[in-house]
Amino acid sequence: MEMLETMETDNSMSIRELNEKMSNDPDLSAVNLDVLTSNGFEPFVLEFPNAEKRSVWEATFKDAKITLAKHLTAAPSWSLKTIIAHQTRPGLQLCTATVVPGKRVDSTPFLWVCASDKFSGQVAVMALDSGEITIETCSAIGNAAVTAMCTVPPPTRPRKRKIKSQKSLEQLQKESIMDINSSGSDTESSSDEGTSTAGQTTVWIGNDDGEVFVVNSTERIRSRTRDRLARLRNSVTSMCAANGNVLVATSYSNQVQLLLFRPASDGGWDLENPQTVGHVCQAPITNMQQIGKRVIIASGNSLHAFFMDTGKFQPPVEILPSSDVITLMNVTGQYVFLSGRKSTEIYVVDVFELSVLNHFNVTSFVRSQLSGREHILREHKMGCLRVSCLTVARHHLWIGTSAGFVLSTSIQAAKSNPTPDLRGLRSRNVKLINEMVSVCEIGHSGPCRILLPVQTPTHSNNPSRKQKRSSLNVPTQQSSQLMLVSCGEGLDDGTATQDPSTDAINHLIFWKFS
């Protein structure tokens, strides 16, 4: 009996010593994580008081990770909001679009859509109110094809104030009050004049003649297009707002130029003296997008990374075959999605290493969608099939095709699966009375040329009096709703009821996510 008690005591002492050793062991009470930042993956260490708390946290973290992965791969639910028929002059094709924020933070944004041919451009401004979406204005701009457009936030300018230490607190308070009042009057006067870009969001529109129009987001395009204009030597191929500046790429023959426009001293933009950025791009720059401190640049079949803070380039990497050119690109998080000219292949690239992670083809899905159509229509659409636009929304990659179909797949599947599960964009209307689901597929009869996600604010219908008076309860009064805009030629609902005469009319389909 004494021997058993001695053994039990020794075992309990051993367990206690082992627990103390595990609690004091830094390897068992710490978790090493790789955190994704704007500069890539960086190590991060979490330390816990003991190994037990570390194991509990690790189990909870793994469960949350599995739940998040299931949420990211699940197909988002959406419904058809409205369809806008954008009647333009014959020959004009939709070429680019951008989302422009409203006058206030909680205001509804606007959608600027450009249509163009070889000799002219046209800009339509659409109001995205909570009710009906309407076309506010439609104006001509320039005498050449519109090639690029981007929304540029107002330039930031640090205010320099020299304060002498001998001044009293009352004097400093009076000066600060005067500064606030004077700055407010300046803002009001500038907004009233409408001829200055100081402190206002602007829309930059470039065309084939090398003209860059800088238009205030709150003014009429027709009356102000010639007030702020930069004339460049070569055709504009791409534009991008990055780190308070604007990058504009131009090209002619084998001359490729990258220009950097900076804010002016008056709070506007210096359009007369752009800075030339040295680069190694051998082909025209077709796309530029900012991610963190870098700008990803597509030139020819290669990707370049330009660091805005240092002005240096990462060595370029060839992504496509030498005979192909990158024409479509979308950058989000850790991944770059791109496609070549007249190609049905989509490549997934790591944004930091610029290495190809995966690539897949959309031909088989489009062929299955066209299986019930007429033979001549099926042969025509399959013969000229290509990926026409790309965007990312709700953790999914959205793909527009020349056949008019809009496809989607989760980013998780796109980055690793050579044959990801592609779905068609559709409107689902649930009939609760009959307990049935009716599905109506809608696309374009011609190419889908633009896909653009739009975030619109939604306000609380019945906020309490306390919420109304509190300035810290903005999230309780305001939330956002995501819409996906599909812009293309004609309308196709999967039946033979549509009028063929509307196939040449540009249509915008607004899908609302729930």
Identify the function of each model-found stretch.
Residues M1-N24, I163-D192, T401-G404:
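Long intrinsically disordered, low-complexity regions that are acidic and Ser/Thr-rich
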Residues A115-K118, N207-D208, T250-S253, A298-N301, ...:
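Structural signature of WD-repeat beta-propellers
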Residues F41, F48, E52-R54, E58-Q93, ...:
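WD40-like beta-propeller blades
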Residues A403-V406, S410-Q412, P447-P463, Q477-S514:
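Blade-level signature of beta-propeller repeat domains, shared across WD40, Kelch, NHL, RCC1
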Residues M1-L72, Q200-T202, N301:
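Canonical pleckstrin homology
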Residues H86-Q122, A144-A148, G184-W204, D208-D209, ...:
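Beta-strand-rich domains and repeat architectures in extracellular enzymes and scaffolds
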Residues T108-P109, Q200-T201, G244-N245, G292-K293, ...:
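Short coil/turn segments that connect the beta-strands within blades of beta-propeller domains
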Residues W112, W204, L247-A249, I296, ...:
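Structural core positions within WD40/WD-like beta-propeller blades
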